Design a protein with these regions (language model features):
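Positively charged, phosphate-engaging catalytic surfaces used for nucleic-acid and nucleotide handling
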Residues: 1-105
Length: 105
């Protein structure tokens, strides 16, 4: 496997652990103020932010198998920024829902 693909796969694995395990656990414990708790919600929010729109308008499904290296790296960075509090999950969730027509401005 080429080096770039290997690194992309590692980033995707990190993204999956962060959104499927780490962030849901934090949402149920130390980060109860977060607006979501389920893994698919974290994935929606992060992927929408990375794609700057509804992710499935930009990526084939399943998204994790179709992320570019840059998208995977951005997703991991964004997850870490959300966890550290450097990026506001509430704001990202609202933007994601706006893109999806779920809430009005």
């Amino acid at each position: 496997m080429p080096k770039q693909q290997s690194r992309t796969a590692d980033l995707v694995s990190q993204y999956m652990v962060l959104t499927k395990e780490t962030m849901p656990h934090l949402a149920r414990t130390s980060h109860r103020h977060w607006p979501v708790q389920n893994d698919h919600c974290f994935q929606r929010i992060v992927l929408d932010a990375v794609c700057e729109g509804v992710w499935y308008d930009y990526l084939l499904r399943p998204a994790y198998k179709n992320l570019t290296h840059d998208q995977a790296a951005n997703a991991v960075d964004l997850c870490n920024d959300i966890i550290s509090g450097d990026t506001d999950l509430i704001t990202l969730n609202k933007q994601s829902l706006k893109w999806r027509g779920k809430i009005l401005t």
